[in-house]
């Protein structure tokens, strides 16, 4: 399972929001490139960037910072936040971004998503941010009547490479992921689901392993890494490649000699 550290960008700095509230932001580091290097050094296999200014304004804003991060590390980088047109996505892919994440546009303009999947195969994922099972849009400022499971099915049919599912009520709260919602979503589609929001401990990460066989292939961790509640290196060791669970027991020795 991929353990994916999140870096939320606001005005060029690494911050965390509480439940998506821009008024409740906490600056963790003035230099996001430094943070990206740290996560790569600790074993991350992918990095998740959110352009918070972009999510609010409807187009990428932190392009210089995103480019600097992509150049500084060798692992794939995925970016979301305000990606609502083809030009914005092409810009990021040209910078070397591995995967772009659309959200609002999936609800408001599904035909554009289909066009994007054809133009940029394997580069388009959809972020489904849900409140009580319904999809939130426009930087979480609005809640639609669209069910998360229905949107996921529609997007899978259009050819997106993955669904990144965030439970807004859990995000930044350290209350643990919503495993029931993740299970329901993964059972409805055949493409990978990446869990996001609420991870507070190593046991939360381990708890998601039970969902791996049905398609939950990764977990995005944000606040818990910055508060120190989760060690990235430990989490990667626990559920990533060569994890504890994959090491066969040593059956060759016996206490009875």
UniProtKB/Swiss-Prot annotation:
Its main location: cytoplasm. One of its GO terms (cellular component) is cytoplasm. Keywords: Amino-acid biosynthesis, Cytoplasm, Histidine biosynthesis, Isomerase. The keyword Amino-acid biosynthesis applies. It is an enzyme of class 5 (isomerase). One of its GO terms (biological process) is L-tryptophan biosynthetic process. Pfam families: His_biosynth (PF00977). GO terms for molecular function: 1-(5-phosphoribosyl)-5-[(5-phosphoribosylamino)methylideneamino]imidazole-4-carboxamide isomerase activity. Belongs to the HisA/HisF family. This is 1-(5-phosphoribosyl)-5-[(5-phosphoribosylamino)methylideneamino] imidazole-4-carboxamide isomerase. It comes from Crocosphaera subtropica (strain ATCC 51142 / BH68) (Cyanothece sp. (strain ATCC 51142)).
């Amino acid at each position: 399972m991929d353990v994916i550290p999140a870096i939320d960008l606001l005005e060029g700095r690494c911050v965390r929001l509480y439940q998506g509230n821009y008024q409740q932001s906490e600056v963790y580091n003035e230099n996001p490139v430094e943070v990206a290097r740290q996560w790569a050094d600790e074993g991350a296999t992918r990095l998740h960037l959110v352009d918070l200014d972009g999510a609010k304004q409807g187009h990428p804003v932190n392009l210089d910072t995103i480019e600097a991060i992509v150049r500084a590390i060798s692992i794939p980088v995925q970016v979301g936040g305000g990606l609502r047109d083809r030009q914005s996505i092409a810009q990021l892919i040209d910078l070397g971004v591995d995967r772009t994440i659309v959200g609002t546009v999936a609800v408001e303009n599904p035909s554009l998503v289909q066009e994007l999947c054809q133009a940029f195969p394997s580069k388009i994922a959809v972020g489904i941010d849900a409140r009580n099972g319904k999809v939130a849009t426009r930087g979480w400022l609005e809640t639609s009547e669209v069910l998360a499971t229905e949107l996921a099915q529609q997007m899978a049919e259009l050819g997106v490479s993955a669904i990144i599912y965030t439970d807004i009520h859990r995000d930044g709260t350290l209350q643990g992921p919503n495993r029931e919602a993740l299970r329901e979503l993964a059972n409805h589609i055949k493409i990978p689901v990446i869990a996001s929001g609420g991870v507070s401990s190593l046991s939360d990460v381990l708890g998601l392993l039970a969902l791996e066989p049905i398609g939950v292939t990764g977990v995005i961790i944000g606040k818990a890494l910055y508060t120190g509640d989760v060690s990235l290196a430990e989490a990667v060791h626990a559920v990533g490649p060569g994890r504890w669970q994959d090491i066969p027991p040593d059956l060759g020795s016996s206490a009875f000699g």
